[in-house]
Protein backbone atom coordinates (compact mmCIF):
# COMPACT_ATOMS: atom_id res chain seq x y z
CA UNK A 1 0.00 0.00 0.00
CA UNK A 2 2.82 2.38 0.93
CA UNK A 3 4.55 1.79 -2.44
CA UNK A 4 1.28 2.38 -4.34
CA UNK A 5 0.72 5.78 -2.64
CA UNK A 6 4.32 6.87 -3.31
CA UNK A 7 4.05 5.70 -6.92
CA UNK A 8 0.81 7.65 -7.40
CA UNK A 9 2.31 10.82 -5.86
CA UNK A 10 5.44 10.41 -8.00
CA UNK A 11 3.41 10.08 -11.20
CA UNK A 12 1.34 13.13 -10.28
CA UNK A 13 4.48 15.22 -9.74
CA UNK A 14 5.98 13.96 -12.97
CA UNK A 15 2.80 14.89 -14.86
CA UNK A 16 2.79 18.42 -13.37
CA UNK A 17 6.45 18.93 -14.29
CA UNK A 18 5.83 17.66 -17.83
CA UNK A 19 2.83 19.95 -18.35
CA UNK A 20 4.77 22.94 -17.01
CA UNK A 21 7.75 22.29 -19.26
CA UNK A 22 5.68 21.53 -22.35
CA UNK A 23 3.92 24.88 -22.06
CA UNK A 24 7.18 26.78 -21.85
CA UNK A 25 8.77 24.78 -24.65
CA UNK A 26 5.89 25.56 -27.02
CA UNK A 27 6.06 29.30 -26.27
CA UNK A 28 8.74 31.40 -27.94
CA UNK A 29 8.92 34.98 -26.77
CA UNK A 30 11.69 37.45 -27.47
CA UNK A 31 12.39 40.14 -24.90
CA UNK A 32 14.84 42.99 -24.60
CA UNK A 33 15.77 46.18 -26.37
CA UNK A 34 14.04 46.53 -29.72
CA UNK A 35 12.86 49.10 -32.23
CA UNK A 36 10.09 49.27 -34.79
CA UNK A 37 10.72 49.30 -38.55
CA UNK A 38 7.81 50.03 -40.89
CA UNK A 39 7.78 49.76 -44.67
CA UNK A 40 5.50 50.23 -47.66
CA UNK A 41 5.42 47.64 -50.44
CA UNK A 42 6.60 49.19 -53.71
CA UNK A 43 6.30 46.09 -55.93
CA UNK A 44 5.18 42.48 -55.86
CA UNK A 45 6.22 40.10 -58.64
CA UNK A 46 4.75 36.60 -58.74
CA UNK A 47 6.53 33.54 -60.14
CA UNK A 48 5.69 29.86 -60.00
CA UNK A 49 6.40 28.78 -56.42
CA UNK A 50 7.75 32.13 -55.26
CA UNK A 51 7.09 35.86 -55.01
CA UNK A 52 9.46 38.82 -54.85
CA UNK A 53 8.38 41.80 -52.76
CA UNK A 54 10.28 45.09 -52.63
CA UNK A 55 9.57 47.72 -50.00
CA UNK A 56 10.98 50.89 -48.48
CA UNK A 57 10.71 52.94 -45.32
CA UNK A 58 12.42 55.29 -42.89
CA UNK A 59 13.92 53.48 -39.91
CA UNK A 60 15.42 54.93 -36.75
CA UNK A 61 18.42 53.54 -34.89
CA UNK A 62 20.77 55.20 -37.42
CA UNK A 63 19.58 53.22 -40.43
CA UNK A 64 17.82 56.06 -42.30
CA UNK A 65 16.11 55.19 -45.58
CA UNK A 66 15.89 51.41 -46.00
CA UNK A 67 15.13 49.47 -49.18
CA UNK A 68 14.24 45.76 -48.91
CA UNK A 69 13.91 42.93 -51.41
CA UNK A 70 12.50 39.60 -50.17
CA UNK A 71 12.17 36.44 -52.27
CA UNK A 72 9.49 34.26 -50.67
CA UNK A 73 9.68 30.55 -51.56
CA UNK A 74 6.70 28.27 -50.98
CA UNK A 75 7.78 25.05 -49.24
CA UNK A 76 4.45 23.66 -48.01
CA UNK A 77 1.94 21.70 -50.08
CA UNK A 78 -0.86 24.13 -49.16
CA UNK A 79 1.17 27.21 -50.19
CA UNK A 80 0.76 28.82 -46.77
CA UNK A 81 4.37 28.78 -45.54
CA UNK A 82 7.96 28.67 -46.65
CA UNK A 83 11.32 30.35 -46.40
CA UNK A 84 12.79 33.56 -47.77
CA UNK A 85 16.05 35.27 -48.58
CA UNK A 86 16.60 38.94 -49.19
CA UNK A 87 18.79 41.98 -49.27
CA UNK A 88 18.59 45.38 -47.61
CA UNK A 89 20.25 48.66 -48.47
CA UNK A 90 20.29 51.55 -46.02
CA UNK A 91 21.47 55.11 -46.47
CA UNK A 92 21.50 57.80 -43.81
CA UNK A 93 21.35 61.59 -44.34
CA UNK A 94 25.15 61.76 -44.26
CA UNK A 95 25.39 59.35 -47.19
CA UNK A 96 26.68 56.33 -45.25
CA UNK A 97 25.38 53.18 -46.90
CA UNK A 98 25.07 49.73 -45.36
CA UNK A 99 24.12 46.38 -46.83
CA UNK A 100 22.35 43.48 -45.13
CA UNK A 101 21.69 39.83 -45.83
CA UNK A 102 18.17 38.69 -44.83
CA UNK A 103 16.94 35.13 -44.33
CA UNK A 104 14.16 33.36 -42.50
CA UNK A 105 10.80 31.64 -42.59
CA UNK A 106 7.22 32.79 -43.13
CA UNK A 107 3.62 31.64 -42.77
CA UNK A 108 0.40 33.15 -44.12
CA UNK A 109 -3.06 33.43 -42.59
CA UNK A 110 -5.50 35.29 -44.83
CA UNK A 111 -3.93 38.58 -45.92
CA UNK A 112 -1.26 38.52 -43.18
CA UNK A 113 2.19 36.98 -43.66
CA UNK A 114 4.21 36.54 -40.45
CA UNK A 115 7.99 36.60 -40.95
CA UNK A 116 10.78 35.45 -38.65
CA UNK A 117 14.13 36.76 -39.88
CA UNK A 118 17.81 36.81 -38.98
CA UNK A 119 19.72 39.66 -40.58
CA UNK A 120 23.42 40.41 -40.87
CA UNK A 121 24.49 44.02 -41.58
CA UNK A 122 27.87 44.97 -43.08
CA UNK A 123 28.76 47.06 -40.00
CA UNK A 124 28.79 43.86 -37.91
CA UNK A 125 25.31 44.28 -36.42
CA UNK A 126 23.10 41.18 -36.32
CA UNK A 127 19.34 41.42 -35.78
CA UNK A 128 16.43 39.08 -35.14
CA UNK A 129 13.08 40.46 -36.28
CA UNK A 130 9.48 39.33 -36.28
CA UNK A 131 7.42 40.98 -38.96
CA UNK A 132 3.89 41.22 -40.23
CA UNK A 133 3.18 41.79 -43.91
CA UNK A 134 -0.33 42.98 -44.72
CA UNK A 135 -0.76 41.96 -48.35
CA UNK A 136 -3.99 43.95 -48.70
CA UNK A 137 -2.74 47.19 -47.08
CA UNK A 138 0.69 46.87 -48.68
CA UNK A 139 2.66 47.30 -45.45
CA UNK A 140 5.44 45.52 -43.54
CA UNK A 141 5.88 46.10 -39.80
CA UNK A 142 8.79 44.63 -37.86
CA UNK A 143 9.90 44.50 -34.24
CA UNK A 144 13.70 44.33 -34.47
CA UNK A 145 15.88 42.90 -31.68
CA UNK A 146 19.64 43.53 -31.93
CA UNK A 147 21.66 40.41 -31.10
CA UNK A 148 24.55 41.08 -28.72
Model region roles, listed by residue range:
Residues 25-148:
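Beta-strand-enriched cores of mature, soluble protein domains
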Residues 10-22:
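Bacterial N-terminal signal peptides
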Amino acid sequence: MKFYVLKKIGLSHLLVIFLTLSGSIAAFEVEGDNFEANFTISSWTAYEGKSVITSEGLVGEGYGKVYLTHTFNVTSSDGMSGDFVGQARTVDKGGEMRFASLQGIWKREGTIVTMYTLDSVTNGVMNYAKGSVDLYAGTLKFSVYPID
